[in-house]
C-alpha cells in the first residue's frame, strides 16, 4: 500500500511519529505510517506557494486537461481505489466501486469543464476616461482537510474546485482513513506540475495545526466536526485566512399524512443507513405526522431489521462497520442515553454487534421528543429517531430548532405544501419526496453551525477565487 507523502512532486516518507491505520471490519492494524514533520509541512506549503506563480497563470484549458487526466486514471484504477477504501473504511466493496468511484470521477470532470466557464463580469466606463473590469482570480495556497467518512470523495470535492480555479493545494486526509488520498497522490504527481498538489499524513495537532496556521496558506477548507471547525477558525483568526467550512448535520425528514409511506420507508432504509449512517446528510431525524406515525414506525422498523451487516467484501452486505473503536463507543453511548429517557422505544437494533470489528446494529428509535439529545445532536451512525408532530407550523418550527443547517427533506403529495415548507426550512438543501441525492452541478453546503461555503457546482468554484477590480485609465 502506498504510504508516502507527496511534497513538491516527490513521494517521501514521513519524518514524524508513526501512527497505526486500522481495518475497522476486523480491528486489525493494516500498517503504520509516519506523520509529516513540522519541516515537511513547511516544505509542502512553500512548494505550493512556489508552484502557484506559474500554475495560477495557466489557462483554464490547461488546468482542465490535467483534471481530465486525473479523472481518467482514477477511473482506470477504480477497483484499486475501491478496495483501499473498503479495507480502510469498512465500506461494502460494491458500494465503494459502484456508487462512489463514478461520482468521484464525475466531480473532476465537472470541474474540468467549469474551469473553462469561470469569468468575471464584463464591465464598462463608470468614471470618464477609465474602463473597469472584474476578475475572479485564484487565491494561492489552499490547505484542505478531508474527513474519514468519505476519504476519496471529499479529497475530490476539495481538490477539484481549488485546482480548477488555479490554486495550489496541500491536502491532509484524516489520519484514520488516509490510504486512498495517498494513492491519489501517487497518480497525481505524474499529471500536475511539482508543488501544485501536496498530500500530507498526520494528526490535527501535529500536522493540521502547523498547516492551517502557516503564513503562506491563504485559505483553509474543512469538512469535519463542529469542534474541529471552531478550532480551525480560532487557530487561523490571527492571520485572517479565508475559511470554507462543512461541519456536519442532523437532517430533518418531514413526513406528512399524505406522503407515500412505501417510498418513505424505502428512502429512509437507504438514505438513513448508507455508509453505516456516517454521513452528514443522513436521513436520521424523522418527524411523522400523527395520522401516519404508527404505520410508519411499524413498516420502517420491519424494513430496517432486514438491513444486512457483514464483511465489506460480501456482495450481500449493506452496512459495514463504523470507522473506529472510539466512534463505535460514541454511537453506543448516544443510544444508551436515549434508552435511559424511558419514553424512547427501541424498535430494532440498539446494540453493538458481537464479534470482531466496529459494528453497530442498524437502529430505529420511536417516541423521541424535540428536546431529546438523540433529536438535537448528531450521532453519525446507523441510528434514526422518529418524532410525532401535529401540524405544519409545529414541524417547521421543530425542524428549524437545531444548531445544524445542512440538509432536509419533505415528503408529501401536496405540491403547494412542498413549496411552502421548503421555502421556510433553514437548510442548505431541501429534497422533496427523496433524500440524499447529489449531483456535481448543484451546490452542497450548510447554514448555522453546519458551516458556510459551497462544495460542487459553479458556486463551489467561485468560493476558491477572489473578486478583483481592475481599472484602466485611457
UniProtKB/Swiss-Prot annotation:
<dbReference type="InterPro" id="IPR016162">
    <property type="entry name" value="Ald_DH_N"/>
</dbReference>
<dbReference type="GO" id="GO:0019145">
    <property type="term" value="F:aminobutyraldehyde dehydrogenase (NAD+) activity"/>
</dbReference>
<comment type="function">
    <text>Catalyzes the oxidation 4-aminobutanal (gamma-aminobutyraldehyde) to 4-aminobutanoate (gamma-aminobutyrate or GABA). This is the second step in one of two pathways for putrescine degradation, where putrescine is converted into 4-aminobutanoate via 4-aminobutanal. Also functions as a 5-aminopentanal dehydrogenase in a a L-lysine degradation pathway to succinate that proceeds via cadaverine, glutarate and L-2-hydroxyglutarate.</text>
</comment>
<dbReference type="Pfam" id="PF00171">
    <property type="entry name" value="Aldedh"/>
</dbReference>
<feature type="binding site">
    <location>
        <begin position="172"/>
        <end position="175"/>
    </location>
    <ligand>
        <name>NAD(+)</name>
    </ligand>
</feature>
<dbReference type="GO" id="GO:0019477">
    <property type="term" value="P:L-lysine catabolic process"/>
</dbReference>
<feature type="active site">
    <location>
        <position position="246"/>
    </location>
</feature>
<feature type="binding site">
    <location>
        <position position="280"/>
    </location>
    <ligand>
        <name>NAD(+)</name>
    </ligand>
</feature>
<dbReference type="InterPro" id="IPR016161">
    <property type="entry name" value="Ald_DH/histidinol_DH"/>
</dbReference>
<keyword id="KW-0520">NAD</keyword>
<keyword id="KW-0560">Oxidoreductase</keyword>
<dbReference type="InterPro" id="IPR017749">
    <property type="entry name" value="PatD"/>
</dbReference>
<feature type="active site" description="Nucleophile">
    <location>
        <position position="280"/>
    </location>
</feature>
<comment type="similarity">
    <text>Belongs to the aldehyde dehydrogenase family. Gamma-aminobutyraldehyde dehydrogenase subfamily.</text>
</comment>
<dbReference type="InterPro" id="IPR029510">
    <property type="entry name" value="Ald_DH_CS_GLU"/>
</dbReference>
<feature type="binding site">
    <location>
        <begin position="225"/>
        <end position="228"/>
    </location>
    <ligand>
        <name>NAD(+)</name>
    </ligand>
</feature>
<dbReference type="InterPro" id="IPR015657">
    <property type="entry name" value="Aminobutyraldehyde_DH"/>
</dbReference>
<feature type="binding site">
    <location>
        <position position="209"/>
    </location>
    <ligand>
        <name>NAD(+)</name>
    </ligand>
</feature>
<comment type="subunit">
    <text>Homotetramer.</text>
</comment>
<protein>
    <recommendedName>
        <fullName>Gamma-aminobutyraldehyde dehydrogenase</fullName>
        <ecNumber>1.2.1.19</ecNumber>
        <ecNumber>1.2.1.-</ecNumber>
    </recommendedName>
</protein>
<comment type="pathway">
    <text>Amine and polyamine degradation; putrescine degradation; 4-aminobutanoate from 4-aminobutanal: step 1/1.</text>
</comment>
<comment type="pathway">
    <text>Amino-acid degradation.</text>
</comment>
<feature type="binding site">
    <location>
        <begin position="146"/>
        <end position="148"/>
    </location>
    <ligand>
        <name>NAD(+)</name>
    </ligand>
</feature>
<dbReference type="GO" id="GO:0009447">
    <property type="term" value="P:putrescine catabolic process"/>
</dbReference>
<dbReference type="InterPro" id="IPR016163">
    <property type="entry name" value="Ald_DH_C"/>
</dbReference>
<dbReference type="InterPro" id="IPR015590">
    <property type="entry name" value="Aldehyde_DH_dom"/>
</dbReference>
<dbReference type="GO" id="GO:0051287">
    <property type="term" value="F:NAD binding"/>
</dbReference>
Amino acid at each position: 500500500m502506498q504510504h508516502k507523502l507527496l511534497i513538491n512532486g516527490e513521494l517521501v516518507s514521513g519524518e514524524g511519529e508513526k501512527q497505526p491505520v486500522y481495518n475497522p471490519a476486523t480491528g486489525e492494524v493494516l500498517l503504520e505510517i509516519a506523520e509529516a514533520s513540522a519541516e515537511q509541512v513547511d516544505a509542502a506549503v512553500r512548494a505550493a506557494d512556489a508552484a502557484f506563480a506559474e500554475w495560477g497563470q495557466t489557462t483554464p484549458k490547461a488546468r482542465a486537461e490535467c483534471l481530465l487526466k486525473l479523472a481518467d486514471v482514477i477511473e482506470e484504477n477504480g477497483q484499486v481505489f475501491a478496495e483501499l477504501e473498503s479495507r480502510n473504511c469498512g465500506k461494502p466493496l460494491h458500494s465503494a466501486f459502484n456508487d462512489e468511484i463514478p461520482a468521484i470521477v464525475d466531480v473532476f470532470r465537472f470541474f474540468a469543464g467549469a474551469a473553462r466557464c469561470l469569468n468575471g463580469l464584463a464591465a464598462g466606463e463608470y468614471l470618464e476616461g477609465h474602463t473597469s473590469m472584474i476578475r475572479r482570480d485564484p487565491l494561492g495556497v489552499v490547505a484542505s482537510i478531508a474527513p474519514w467518512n468519505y476519504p476519496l470523495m471529499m479529497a475530490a470535492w476539495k481538490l477539484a474546485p481549488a485546482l480548477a480555479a488555479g490554486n495550489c493545494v496541500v491536502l491532509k486526509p484524516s489520519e484514520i482513513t488516509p490510504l486512498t488520498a495517498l494513492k491519489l497522490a501517487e497518480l497525481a504527481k505524474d499529471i500536475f506540475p511539482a508543488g501544485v498538489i501536496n498530500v500530507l499524513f498526520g494528526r490535527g495537532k501535529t500536522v493540521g495545526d502547523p498547516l492551517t496556521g502557516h503564513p503562506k496558506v491563504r485559505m483553509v477548507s474543512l469538512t469535519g466536526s463542529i469542534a474541529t471547525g471552531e478550532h480551525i477558525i480560532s487557530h487561523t483568526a490571527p492571520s485572517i485566512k479565508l475559511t470554507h467550512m462543512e461541519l456536519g448535520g442532523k437532517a430533518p425528514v418531514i413526513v406528512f399524512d399524505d406522503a407515500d409511506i412505501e417510498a418513505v420507508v424505502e428512502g429512509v432504509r437507504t438514505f438513513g443507513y448508507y455508509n453505516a449512517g456516517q454521513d452528514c446528510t443522513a436521513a436520521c431525524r424523522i418527524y411523522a405526522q400523527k395520522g401516519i406515525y404508527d404505520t410508519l414506525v411499524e413498516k420502517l422498523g420491519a424494513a430496517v431489521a432486514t438491513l444486512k451487516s457483514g464483511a465489506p467484501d460480501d456482495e450481500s452486505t449493506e452496512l459495514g462497520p463504523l470507522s473506529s473503536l472510539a466512534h463505535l463507543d460514541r454511537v453506543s453511548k448516544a443510544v444508551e442515553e436515549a434508552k435511559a429517557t424511558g419514553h424512547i422505544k427501541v424498535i430494532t437494533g440498539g446494540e453493538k454487534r458481537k464479534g470482531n470489528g466496529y459494528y453497530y446494529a442498524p437502529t430505529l428509535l420511536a417516541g423521541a421528543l424535540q428536546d431529546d439529545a438523540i433529536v438535537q445532536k448528531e450521532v453519525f451512525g446507523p441510528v434514526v429517531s422518529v418524532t410525532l408532530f401535529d401540524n405544519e407550523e409545529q414541524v417547521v418550527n421543530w425542524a428549524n430548532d437545531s444548531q445544524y443547517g445542512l440538509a432536509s427533506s419533505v415528503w408529501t403529495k401536496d405540491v403547494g405544501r412542498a413549496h411552502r415548507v421548503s421555502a421556510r426550512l433553514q437548510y442548505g438543501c431541501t429534497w422533496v419526496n427523496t433524500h440524499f441525492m447529489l449531483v456535481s452541478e448543484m451546490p452542497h453546503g450548510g447554514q448555522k453551525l453546519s458551516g458556510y461555503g459551497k462544495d460542487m457546482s459553479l458556486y463551489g468554484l467561485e468560493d476558491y477565487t477572489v473578486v478583483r477590480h481592475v481599472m484602466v485609465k485611457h
